[in-house]
Structures are given as structure tokens and as C-alpha cells.
Regions:
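Beta-strand-enriched accessory nucleic-acid recognition/scaffold domains that flank the catalytic cores
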Residues: 1-604, 611, 615-993
Length: 993
């Protein structure tokens, strides 16, 4: 009853009687103050009515958007919003400048502070909702909300809308790595929105059975939104296109046209794809332009594009997606992109986009100085854009098994004892790593994750942070173990010490021996008949920071690509040493001769950026070496007899949502492999593997994979964690592995024991701490926004990308991969701010600022611990009331250097916390505030900027506009003043300008 009443905006008074009286309902009227009645539109019934400009109350688009976002998230109810509230917002907004709008900032704070409480229970909805919106104007914290600092050049602010069957949820603009389209139209960035279609939020992804009509209404809603567009904040957004990764998660970009720029204009600029009449391929080609990329600075000498031939034989392409790049050009890319913090050597390969071309570029010594060599298999369409864009670089990460690969290897003859032995040792290793620093460092250096976070953690141990029990590091160590154990239990993710997970590329020298069809079904174990590969990886046991030492793998290996469902998806190969290939590392090199290319045998892979696992552990070499690969089914794509229209793209989007059965088929295959005697070799499993391959290609071919009822499991093994009524206990290898692993909970706890080596290193001025504290507030807001936008519970999960919760949409691997550029950009933003504050990257200037970030974080924790005393059984609730502590660790390398420095400490003992830094009210009196503004940054010398920041006090953002308003009476004059004179309010913004 309580939840139902709250849906109707009824405040629940727990002290009142149980008598309930029925009163007349309220109809929201505030929309009429902002929107004239339009023919055919009943605004009183709109769930998120359209705000429009009228003469008496004007709210800019970004203010209207934030207001609708607050309503959509349940913070405001329409009946509580009055004309007076709107007028107050409009008055605040009239003083808007280039950098801020007080009304927008007020609503942004309201949205972030309420939504970030992560109240999931409807029973607690009253903790989230504001019944009296006018009370916001009395909230000093809300009124003094500081605008975000600026972004790195490769990021952009993006608005996101989630459309469910019953409503829409709007999110505040969040920083995201940009793509080609958003960079080209950066002046229109507020006219782009990302839209995602889901079931209700607590359910997540929309799952549908194409045989039933129960979901027709739902998919009709999706179709209407795509066809008619979405109206938000007085703007009409229309469907633009869908990025390829977005597509699988049911997302798309929408754009609000102007008189001079339409969606058709943008699609035409993206590329010439009119010759493509397969709707799926047409959509996929447009989607290339939305890949998250970074662009290097222009080379003084430019780059020369040279077109070379593919290597083909009997209809198979051995160089599908791979090109070449000169050493000098590759070095220039890395110097100008700073793509990775962990690379100690120049990457051998770059995943890229260049106009309508895609794939990877591999370093080769025969490529002249500034040339890039492209192949026909890489060119997909012609595009106006001609710049080289980089997605990611080659890097080493350790190979791991999963439920599919274990199932396949087991059916090929690998004994179950091998898997059980490996899992038992891995569990023991995780336990030992919690107390043995040297062993933990070795394990972290060996078990490198896809984002390279474990190598950073290993360096933290080398810097002594495990010995001092530094709280942030110790929590990271525990979450790494809990995350690893969860994946062990749920995914059978067993790390393989003698294994690698790397990009695939081609042998341009044609030295490696290729595959022979004559060996298919052969019982021979003659290594001279095996296809060959080349692989060079970091030496085992190399300490963190000493990368650059590599070893060439030789001997019998197993090779594959995830997911592997067919017995022939995993190949037995021979790794050999070829001197002409030794310049390549952290990539697996495939032969370019033979009857068929190896990548296509591995779950239909190619060389345009696919990752392959290579394992040379003798225990995992199967007894069956030559199982034939799955026969490729040449599905003929659906081709139109006319040009593709926008309506075709929309229909295909909805059709894909309704018929996407990829995960359903994968689960059916896993269950059937466990229940059937022959496992993956059973005809039913072979058919499911074929269907899965077709489902993977559905976004490219437009041909859906239909799962017949006879192939659907009636019951599931217990390790799949399905409903108890449809579960049986599995006695096969996956069931036994599942039972070995205990569930480990992650409960972070702060005890306040920070590293004294950093706290005592420098004597820090109060003014510096004050300014750094201001930057930390911005960091924490940005971190919370990332956590909220990506459904992440703690900052430790976000920082490490070791997420403990399952994603509502998409897979866990892809989610972790997508978080890497988000967190890299986040770190860069706040590193840049602190470096600008220091005035230099020189350690003498920068390290005191880094130490200040650690000091203010420590002080917040100390004071919070006093305010929130520990109570038995309240560890979790206490943790969530503590301040965020990840801010200093945007400088994890520099913190290590400070901690390990041999210099004398400037402080004899740990300083006492400065409680003034944590006052909730940052307001100075008017005289002091005007003095700060009067001492604002002037001149062009960077040192002057820094001095101004060191001597400034904490600045209340709302006061700035008030002071400016006293000096100017018109909006035009305000803009003029903003451009001509920097005020104290802009001190933080200048840090990243």
C-alpha cells in the first residue's frame, strides 16, 4: 500500500493513524505555463510532457532537459512543480555564462545526489523524491553546486535516455570517449543523445520469443520511438544510426535536426554506402563511424596510404582485415596518443579506423618511413573522413579457460583431472596472495587482465603499499580476489599460466606452414603436419616495471577464439621461432599459406581486431589433434532490389531485438553438452553450434537463427543457476568445478590507516590543500556519475574495472572492455587538473600537489570515521557513508615514487586533520569573496595562474554569478565580461583549459 500511495505522490507519515481518506486527484498544470496547447496533443496525459518556449517563462534546453530528467527519475512529481518554481529557475538561468548555468547546475546536483543514493527499493522511494521543489533554493549545497571541470580532447559530454515499456529515464550529460561523428559535429554535441531500449530497469535486457505475440506491443513501442522520434526539452530527436557495439545492446544515436543540418546530412557525410542493398550490412557500415577512437596529432610530414593486395587461395583470405604500418609512423602514434599507461615497448599492432577502412595495422620493417598499407579486405566503403583513428593497441594478457573451452577440450581428450588440479591450485594461490606480498606481486604480474590493472597493482606492491596496508590498495587486492573467485565459480574462468590472449595477425614473409585439408579426421600426431604460428610474449617472472624482455614460445599449442562451441573451433598448432618475425610481440602470427586460413576455423574469426587464446600447457593439449573445423554455412544475405531507406534500418533494428537469440542458443548448447553422452560432438550440439554461428552473423547478414523447440533444454545443470524446479545436479567436469569454489563476498572497509610515508613527506600549505579539496569534490562527483551510469556499486570496482555485479545489458567481458576508455579518460581529466595546478610535470612541482590529494582524502576519512563510529554488523552501511578515496590514485605511479623516496620527511609525525576543509558551508563573506575575484588570474604566464590558485580560498560557485550580475544588467554584457575577464569562480575551470 505504501509503495502504491507513493506512486501517487502521497507522503507517508509513519506517526499518523491508519485512517485513509479519499481526496480528489491533482492534475499537473505547470506544463501549461511552459507549453502552449497544441492541436492533437493532450499535455495533461503526457508522462514526460514537452517543454516549449513561451513569452513569460523561458528555460534553455539544457535546463529543461535536467528538469525532465529529475521527473523521469522520480525525484519530482509533476503535480508538485509550480509556476513559482519555474520562474525561480528562469531567473537563475538568466545569468548564464559560457561555463555555467545556475539553474542547470542546481538540477544536476539534485539529480546526481538523489539517483546516486542508488535507492532500488520502491519502499524507500520517499528517500529519493522531493515533495517541495521550492526547498531546493534553501539548500546551500545544492545552490553552490560547482560545474564540472573541462574534458580531455578525446572526450565529449553525452546525454543518455533509457526507454522502457512504460516510460523514459533521462540521465545527466556524462563524459564519454568520442567517435568520428561526434568529433565532426562537436558544435552540435547537445543535439545528440544515446537511446537504449530495455525492459523495466529491474529486469534489464528485453528478451523475446519470436513465436509468440505477447511482446508485440513492446516492440511496437520501440518501432514508434525510432520512426517518430523522441521529444525532450522542447526538441524533437530523430533516429540517426547505430554503432556496432550499441546494436547488440539495443542502443542507437538520435539527433535533433536544425534548419541547416539534418540526420540525412550526417549520414551522407559518414560515407557512401548507397551501393549496399543488404540492410544489415548497410547499418553495420554506418556503425563503423561510431567506434570509440582517438586521433593523433597531425604529422608534420603527413602519411602516405598505399594499397596492397590481399593474400588469397581457393576462396579463403589469409589477410582478412590486416594491413601494415611503418615503425616510424607507429612510434609517432604512440607518442601523440598516450594510449596506455602500462606499455614499456612500442605495440606491434594498432586496431584502427581510416575513412571507410577498418582492421589492424602491424609494424613491418619493409614499410617505408611514413607509409600505411591497406588491403581490399579492409576497405568497406568510401568516406569523407581521411584521418587515421586508433581504437586500441596490441597488449599481452593471460589466457583463461571458460565453460565452453573446458567442454570442448574435455571432449577432445583433455582429462578432467587437469582442470580440477588447475582450479585447486588457483584457489590456493588467491588465498596465499592475501598475506604474501612477494607472491601476490608475482601472481598479479602473471595473471594480467585485459585492461592491465593487475600490472599496476603489482607495482603498488613493489612500492610498499601492501606492507604498509594502505587502505585503497588493500581493498583493490580483496576485490581482485573476490572478482576472480566469482568468475571461477560462475564462468569456470581458470587462468592458464602458460597461455596468452592477444590480437591475431598475418605472416607477411610466408614462412609459417599452413593448414592441410588432408589432415582432417586424421589420427596422426605428427607435428610436421601441424600448421605453425609465431608468438612472442613477456618473460615469465619479469618484475613490474621491467617489461621489454620477451621470449618466443615453441612447441605444441592449442589455439582458439571465444566463444568456442564446435569441437573444431579449437585447433592444435605448432609454435616455432622465425627470426624474420621477432620484431612482433604480444600478437599471434598466423600462416598465409595452406588450404585454408586458421582464423576462420576458430569460430569464424578474422584479423580485423579479433583476440585469440594460445595455450602451451602440456596438460591442456588434447589427444585428438585434427578434428575438422565446422563447415561454413554460406548464408545469402537478404538483398533489396532498391536502395536502402531509413524505414528499412528501423525495421531491421526492431527485428533484431525481437529475434536475437544468441544468448539463448549459447545457454542451450551448454546445457545440452552437459546432459548428452557425447557432449559437444552430439548432433544436437553440432546443430546448436551452427545456429550460434548464424546468430553471431545476424547483424551482418540479416538472417536470423531460429531455435527449434526440440533443441531447447527441458532441464539445466545446477552450475547454470536456473530455477530449482528445472535444475538437476551435474556430475560432469563443470558441475564438479562449480562445487569446488566457495562464494566470496566483497565488503570494503576503511580503517583509516593511510600510508605515513606520503602523509609525512611534505609540509603542505593550507591554501594548496583548500584548492586540491575543491578538485576532489569534482572528482568524486564525476566518479559517482560513472558508477551510476554503468550500474557499479563501488569506486573500487570502477577504478579497477573488476565489477562484482552482472551487467543489465551485454556480457561481462565487453562491459569490462568498455570501461577501460571511460576510466582512462576520467583519470586523465583529473591528472590534467592537478598538473595544471602544479604548473609543471617536474617532480619538484608536481609531487607536493599529488601528496596534497592523498592528504585531503586521508583527512576526509579521519573525520568521517569520527562521525560514523563502527557498529557491530554495520560494516556495509558504514562503508557507504564514507567518502570516496580513489582521487589520489589517478597518480598511482607518482604516489609510489613519493612513498619510496629516500629524501628526509618534512614532518616529524602525521599531521592532524584540518576540519575546516570539510565544512559543509563553503561560503565566504562578500568582502572576502570579492577579494578573491579581484585577485583572479591575470596575464599569460602559467606560473601566475598557479600562484593565483595557491592563494585562493574555497569558492562558492553560486556567488560568482551574483557578483557578475551586480556588474552587468544584460545577458550580452555577461557574455562579454565572461570572455574578457576570468573570475575567481573560473579558477578550477582554468586548470584544464
Amino acid at each position: 500500500m505504501k509503495a502504491a500511495l507513493q506512486e501517487f505522490n502521497i507522503v507517508i507519515d509513519h506517526k499518523s493513524s491508519n485512517d485513509i481518506k479519499i481526496v480528489p486527484s491533482l492534475i499537473p498544470s505547470f506544463w501549461d505555463s511552459l507549453e502552449p496547447q497544441q492541436p492533437g496533443i493532450d499535455t495533461s496525459k503526457a508522462s514526460l510532457a514537452l517543454l516549449a518556449d513561451v513569452e513569460d517563462i523561458y528555460l534553455p534546453y539544457d535546463v529543461q532537459y535536467q528538469l525532465e530528467a529529475c521527473i523521469s527519475q522520480g525525484i519530482f512529481n509533476e503535480v508538485n512543480i509550480t509556476t513559482e518554481f519555474l520562474r525561480r529557475l528562469a531567473n537563475l538561468s538568466r545569468g548564464r555564462t559560457r561555463r555555467r548555468d545556475r539553474a542547470k547546475d542546481l538540477l544536476t546536483y539534485t539529480l546526481q545526489s538523489r539517483v546516486e543514493n542508488r535507492v532500488e527499493s520502491r519502499d524507500k522511494l520517499d528517500e529519493k523524491r522531493i515533495y517541495d521543489p521550492m526547498s531546493l533554493f534553501e539548500d546551500k549545497t545544492a545552490m553552490s553546486h560547482y560545474p564540472e571541470i573541462s574534458l580531455p580532447g578525446h572526450c565529449i559530454w553525452v546525454r543518455k535516455v533509457v526507454v522502457t515499456p512504460t516510460t523514459m529515464y533521462l540521465s545527466s550529460p556524462a563524459p564519454e570517449p568520442s567517435n568520428r561523428v561526434l568529433r565532426q559535429y562537436t558544435n552540435y554535441e547537445d543535439r545528440f543523445i544515446r537511446v537504449q531500449f530495455t525492459d523495466e530497469l529491474i529486469k534489464g535486457r528485453i528478451y523475446s520469443d519470436p513465436d509468440t505475440t505477447r511482446d508485440n506491443a513492446l516492440f511496437n513501442r520501440v518501432h514508434r520511438a525510432l520512426q517518430n522520434g523522441i521529444r525532450i526539452g522542447g526538441r524533437h530527436f530523430q533516429y540517426l544510426a547505430t554503432g556496432n557495439s550499441q546494436f547488440r545492446e539495443h542502443g542507437a544515436y538520435f539527433f535533433c535536426p536544425t534548419d541547416f543540418l539534418t540526420c540525412d546530412n550526417i549520414r551522407n557525410w559518414m560515407g557512401d554506402v548507397n551501393h549496399i542493398r543488404v540492410v544489415a550490412k548497410y547499418a553495420s557500415r554506418l556503425g563503423q563511424c561510431f567506434s570509440t577512437t582517438r586521433i593523433p596529432k597531425a604529422s608534420p610530414i603527413g602519411q602516405a596510404i598505399v594499397h596492397i593486395d590481399d593474400i588469397e587461395h581457393d576462396g579463403w583470405c589469409f589477410t582478412d582485415g590486416v594491413g601494415k604500418i611503418a615503425f616510424s609512423r607507429a612510434k609517432f602514434l604512440m607518442q601523440n596518443l598516450d594510449m596506455t599507461r602500462t606499455a614499456k615497448t612500442l605495440p606491434s599492432a594498432f586496431q584502427f579506423r581510416l575513412g571507410g577502412s577498418k582492421g589492424i595495422l602491424v609494424q613491418w620493417p619493409d614499410v617505408p618511413f611514413n607509409e600505411v598499407h591497406l588491403r581490399p579486405s579492409q576497405n568497406k566503403f568510401n568516406a569523407v573522413s581521411k584521418g587515421l583513428e586508433i581504437i586500441k593497441t596490441s597488449r599481452f594478457s593471460i589466457a583463461s579457460l571458460n565453460r565452453q573451452t573446458i567442454t570442448i577440450l574435455s571432449c577432445l581428450g583433455v582429462p578432467d583431472e587437469a582442470f580440477e588440479e588447475m582450479m585447486k591450485k588457483q584457489i590456493a594461490d588467491y588465498e596465499r596472495a592475501m598475506t604474501d606480498a612477494e607472491f601476490a606481486m608475482q601472481l598479479l604480474s602473471k595473471y594480467v587482465d585485459q585492461n592491465g590493472i593487475t600490472t599496476i597493482m603489482a607495482q603498488m606492491i613493489a612500492d610498499g603499499f601492501m606492507e604498509t596496508k594502505e587502505p585503497f590498495f588493500m581493498i583493490l587486492l580483496h576485490i581482485w580476489r573476490a572478482w576472480s573467485m566469482r568468475l571461477l565459480r560462475e564462468k569456470a574462468r581458470i587462468m592458464v599460466d602458460k597461455g596468452a590472449f592477444v590480437f591475431g595477425c598475418a605472416d607477411e614473409t610466408r614462412t609459417l606452414r599452413g593448414h592441410s585439408d588432408a589432415t582432417d579426421f586424421s589420427q596422426s600426431k605428427d607435428r610436421n603436419t601441424l600448421p605453425q604460428i609465431f608468438l612472442q610474449v613477456p618473460k615469465t617472472g619479469v618484475r613490474t616495471g621491467e617489461q621489454g624482455e620477451y621470449t618466443v614460445i615453441t612447441g605444441i599449442c592449442v589455439l582458439g577464439r571465444n566463444p568456442s562451441l564446435h569441437p573444431g573451433d579449437i585447433r592444435v598448432v605448432e609454435a616455432v621461432d622465425v627470426p624474420a618475425l621477432r620484431h612482433l610481440h604480444d600478437v599471434v602470427v598466423f600462416p598465409t599459406v595452406g588450404d585454408r586460413d586458421i582464423p576462420s576455423m576458430c569460430s569464424g574469426g578474422d584479423l580485423d581486431g579479433d583476440d585469440y587464446f594460445v595455450i602451451w600447457d602440456p596438460r591442456l593439449i588434447p589427444t585428438e589433434w585434427n578434428h575438422p573445423p565446422m563447415k561454413q554455412e554460406n548464408l545469402k544475405p537478404k538483398e533489396l532490389d532498391r536502395d536502402v531507406k531509413l524505414t528499412d534500418l528501423i525495421s531491421f533494428f526492431v527485428s533484431y531485438m525481437k529475434n536475437d537469440s544468441l544468448s539463448t542458443i549459447a545457454h542451450a548448447h551448454l546445457a545440452k553438452c552437459d546432459s548428452l553422452t557425447d557432449g559437444p560432438k552430439d548432433p544436437q550440439c553440432i546443430e546448436l553450434a551452427r545456429l550460434h554461428s548464424n546468430a553471431v552473423d545476424y547483424p551482418k547478414t540479416g538472417q536470423k537463427a531460429y531455435l527449434e523447440a526440440s533443441l531447447r533444454p527441458k532441464n539445466y545443470p545446477h552450475f547454470m543457476e536456473k530455477a530449482p524446479s528445472r535444475t538437476y545436479r551435474s556430475t560432469k567436469i563443470l558441475g564438479r568445478l562449480y562445487d569446488q569454489v566457495a562464494q566470496i563476498e566483497f565488503n570494503p572497509e576503511l580503517d583509516g590507516t593511510f600510508d605515513q610515508r606520503i602523509l609525512r613527506r611534505y609540509s603542505l600549505k593550507y591554501e594548496l590543500l583548500k584548492t586540491v579539496r575543491m578538485i576532489k569534490r569534482q572528482h568524486d562527483k564525476a566518479m559517482r556519475q560513472i558508477m551510476n551510469q554503468h550500474d557499479i556499486e563501488t569506486e573500487f570496482e570502477a577504478w579497477s574495472t573488476f565489477m562484482m555485479s552482472k551487467p543489465r545489458l551485454g556480457g561481462e567481458y565487453k562491459r569490462q572492455e568498455n570501461m577501460e576508455p571511460v576510466m582512462t579518460s576520467h583519470r586523465e581529466r583529473f591528472r590534467d587538473a592537478c598538473i595544471k595546478l602544479a604548473g609543471s610535470r617536474d617532480p619538484d612541482a608536481l609531487y607536493p600537489v599529488v601528496a596534497a590529494t592523498y592528504r585531503v582524502t586521508w583527512e576526509e576519512v579521519q573525520i568521517a570515521l569520527r562521525r560514523v563510529p563502527a557498529a557491530v554488523g554495520e560494516t556495509e552501511s558504514r562503508m557507504y557513508s564514507m567518502p570516496l578515496i580513489s582521487f589520489p590514485w589517478v597518480f598511482e605511479y607518482e604516489l609510489g615514487r613519493i612513498a619510496m623516496a629516500k629524501d628526509k620527511f618534512e614532518l616529524e609525525e602525521v599531521p592532524k586533520p584540518t576540519t575546516a576543509l570539510l565544512d559543509d558551508d563553503y561560503t565566504d563573506d562578500d568582502d572576502e569573496f570579492k577579494r578573491i575575484i579581484g585577485a583572479s588570474i591575470s596575464g599569460s604566464d602559467e606560473t601566475d595562474d598557479v600562484e593565483g590558485l595557491y592563494t585562493g580560498q574555497s569558492i562558492q560557485a553560486t556567488q560568482v554569478a551574483e557578483v557578475v550580475e551586480e556588474q552587468s544588467t544584460t545577458h550580452e554584457e555577461l557574455v562579454e565580461l565572461e570572455e574578457d575577464e576570468d573570475t575567481g569562480m573560473d579558477a578550477l575551470a582554468k586548470l584544464t583549459d
